[in-house]
Amino acid sequence: MSPRIGLTQKMIVDAAAEIADQEGVNGVSLAALSKKMNVRPPSLYNHINGLQAIRAELAVRGLTKLFDQMADSVTERKGDSAMLSLAHAYVDFAIENPGYYEAALLKVHDKRTEIVSDQIVCLVTKLLIENGYASEKTAIHATRGLRSLLHGFTVLIAKEAFEREEDILESLSFSIRTFLSGLLINNKNIM
């Protein structure tokens, strides 16, 4: 069977991202994709190598878009300004792109995800070290702590769990500044 004219892998992954935004990554299936794209499921195999390949593409795109947004947010910034901007970029990305964000957290066996994940870790650890929040020895621990804090905020915002009237993004900034203050104290005590 020849590929449908005009159907591309990019179109399939774009459709998968739309489904993931609405239904989560588990909602992405070949049946859901074929229905959304108005093609028979076997037609998809002319362009992709199954559901795992689609998930891998979503993960790569998600991680790449997250990295780009984080890297852009810290251009020409230092200290708290850089870290706050990075934190808000992370949370904004996750809220605005729930499908890509969920896919970015998937464990897929694809070298590209490892490369982009390493770029994200290097970006954050470099900022933490350059701005005095961590040493080479503590940077990974600080990065994990920051990621956990940001992911927690992301999940709670997505679930609409913050029901009080206080501004959520102010709460995020407050939490990040508090976390960074703790890192500064910890880093000075270690040195």
UniProtKB/Swiss-Prot annotation:
Residues 6-66 form the HTH tetR-type domain. It comes from the Bacteria. The keyword Repressor applies. One of its GO terms (molecular function) is DNA binding. InterPro entries: Homeodomain-like_sf, HTH_TetR, MT1864/Rv1816-like_C, Tet_transcr_reg_TetR-rel_C_sf. Residues 29-48 bind DNA. This is Uncharacterized HTH-type transcriptional regulator YobS. The lineage of its organism: Bacteria, Bacillati, Bacillota, Bacilli, Bacillales.
